[in-house]
Amino acid sequence: MASPSILKKYGKYFEYCPLEERMIELAKKGEIADAMLLFEKEKPSEFVYKGDAIEKRLRNIYLSTRLGVKAKINFNDYVIPRDLRWMLDIYESYLNMGENKVFLILGGELRYLIDFFESYLQFKGFYLLVVKEAKDLLRFRNTCHYDAIIFSDSSILEYQNVDELKNLFNSLETTLKVHNRKNSVKVLLSPALPKAIMSSKPYKVLEQFFKEKGIEMEGILPYQLNADDKLLPPHFHNSEMEKSKEYRELESKTKVYIQEFLKKANMNDENEGNDNQKNTN
């Protein structure tokens, strides 16, 4: 039987539906925590999924029903360029550690890739909060269900009220403790963060804040910066001219790839909308 709080919130019909149907219904609404609570309360012996497995399945249900076409794209149909592939593998390996709540701070030239990373990680079953601008940080107050929080560097620079920014991170830390995720924050820094950001007051305050809280900050992208502050994957040659040429080619190919990906996503979205309209008619 469902808990009184869930019955009050969602209606008595939940009491009579099979457990799996009730959980899926909650998952479609994004109520992953309540769906997991049902599972924890009742724990039927015939249930195949346990713990993290059922939570991941529920997240996939939510993603497929609420987050639109990006979560539905089958990345297995794509040939992902090598220089994106190894970055995605690094991110995925950190997220798969399970116990870590992870921040991914994407800097500099990587900013235009943020939609791609979001889409890919959603496809792999992770539930993300993407911070693209300062106002998105307000959503920190309810982050207990996120596997990762992805920053763009501009979201830090735009948030000029440092005290409010620190309060939001304090709120996040409290949320994590309430949900028994102790020591679960790790900050992954891209060494490609532009100097303007690394020397900015908001960034310095955050750096000190994380240090005081004992939160680990770790660089994971083995990029280098040339004199023009361009990102250079580590396997590139030493010649500045060769680096610049190869970088521009890689950047151009990658942007084309992302544009094609997003174009296909939009086409799928339009087709799905047309199908829904036909079904409605």
Swiss-Prot record:
Source domain of life: Eukaryota
Main location: plastid
Protein's recorded name: Uncharacterized 33.1 kDa protein in rbcL-atpE intergenic region
Keyword tags: Chloroplast, Plastid
Gene Ontology cellular-component terms listed: chloroplast
Subcellular location: Plastid, Chloroplast
Organism the protein comes from: Euglena gracilis
Species classification: Eukaryota, Discoba, Euglenozoa, Euglenida, Spirocuta
